[in-house]
Structure formats: C-alpha cells, structure tokens
UniProtKB/Swiss-Prot annotation:
This is NADH-quinone oxidoreductase subunit K 1. NDH-1 is composed of 14 different subunits. Subunits NuoA, H, J, K, L, M, N constitute the membrane sector of the complex. One of its GO terms (biological process) is ATP synthesis coupled electron transport. The chain crosses the membrane at residues 7-27, 31-51, 63-83. Belongs to the complex I subunit 4L family. The gene is nuoK1.
Length: 103
C-alpha cells in the first residue's frame, strides 16, 4: 500500500504535523492545548520513524515507535493528572496565571 504513495508525502505530512505542534506549543496559552501540541509532535516523529523503517525494510523503527507510544501513554496519564491538580488548586488553565508561584 505504501508503494503507491511516495515516501516524501509521508515525510511532508510528518513535517506539517510537527510544525503545527510547535506552533501550538509556542502560541497557545491553555495548558491542555499545549499538552495536545506536544502529543502531536510525538506522533509526527512516530510517523517519520515508521516511514523510514518501512523504506529500509527494517523493524527497528516500528519497535521504537511502539515504545514511544507506550511512554507517551504513561506521560499522558501523568500529565492529565497534573493538569487536573493545577485546575483544582488554581481554577484556571491559563499558563500565564499558573506560572506565578504566589497563591
């Protein structure tokens, strides 16, 4: 199936997804949006790993992507727990309001 679509298209899609993630990380002020942007960047890198792995007929990229997804799932659980705790304590998810150390 991937032989019908050039490899450059997958890498271009990966670059676009990564750029959207960076833009969301840099320009958004909501913690959940920033968190989702980081996850989008991770998935863009995973797409690149799988693309190169398929092109070179090796399994290493697929295995590495699997482990990255496992770690990302654990990171998502911990990150959402932290976000929930911050929201309970501060009643806001704006990064500028959460950054201040005073209560």
């Amino acid at each position: 199936m991937m032989n019908a679509v050039p490899i450059s298209w997958f890498l271009t899609l990966s670059a676009i997804l990564f750029a959207l993630g960076v833009a969301g990380f840099l320009f958004r002020r909501n913690i959940i949006t920033v968190f989702m942007s980081i996850e989008l960047m991770l998935n863009a890198v995973n797409l690149s790993f799988v693309t190169f792995s398929y092109q070179h007929k090796e399994v290493a990229g697929h295995l590495f992507t699997f482990f990255v997804m496992v770690v990302a799932a654990a990171e998502a659980a911990v990150g959402l727990a932290i976000i929930l705790t911050v929201f309970k304590n501060r009643s806001t998810l704006n990064i500028d309001d959460v950054n201040s150390m005073k209560n």
